[in-house]
């Protein structure tokens, strides 16, 4: 993680979740990553990742997804990505990703997910690593535009909490997880 404050949050989160051995790096993954991988005998020991790549990067962020997937041998990835990332300039990366990995699900997220920060429409892509996507593979598409939360515009919010569970949000997220995990 390149941002120091986010790095600290990530480390604290892992410790609170009982994983004190996570080797989270504070720095640019393109500069620090190769050193880390070299020191781990050219393997990336993760079998799962959660990635929110910068949408301004090549392929609308899919270059980061492609790189993360290429460093894993097995496992799964969850990517919070610009919904149209797989088309236009992202098309080349999407094709390369699917040649080696399987898209399990695409989850359309609420329009106001990043209200006050960004107006980009996002989706979560769930991917199985190192299993080429076949033409007859079933992909689950979920419209999760109504997730049960009400959000306030972060720039205009006067409340400390701008996210309120107003319509069974926790149950809705549990249902989506159950659908995706089978």
Residue positions per predicted region:
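Conserved S-adenosyl-L-methionine
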Residues: 1-48, 54, 58, 81-84
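A conserved structural/catalytic subdomain of Rossmann-like adenosyl-cofactor enzymes
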Residues: 26, 43-182
């Amino acid at each position: 993680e390149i941002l120091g404050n986010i790095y600290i949050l990530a480390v604290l989160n892992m410790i609170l979740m009982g994983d004190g051995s996570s080797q989270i790096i504070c720095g640019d993954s393109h500069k620090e990553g190769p050193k880390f991988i070299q020191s781990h005998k050219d393997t990336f020991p993760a079998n799962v990742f959660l990635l929110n790549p910068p949408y301004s990067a090549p392929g609308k962020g899919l270059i980061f997804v492609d790189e993360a997937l290429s460093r894993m041998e097995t496992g799964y990835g969850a990517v919070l990505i610009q919904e149209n990332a797989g088309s236009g300039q992202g098309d080349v990366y999407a094709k390369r990703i699917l040649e080696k990995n399987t898209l399990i699900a695409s989850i359309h997220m609420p329009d106001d997910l990043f209200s006050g920060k960004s107006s980009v429409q996002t989706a979560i892509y769930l991917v199985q690593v190192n299993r080429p996507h076949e033409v007859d593979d079933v992909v689950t598409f979920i419209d999760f535009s109504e997730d049960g939360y009400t959000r306030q515009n972060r720039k205009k919010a006067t409340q400390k909490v701008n996210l309120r569970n107003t319509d069974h949000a926790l149950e809705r997220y549990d249902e989506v997880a159950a659908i995706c995990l089978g």
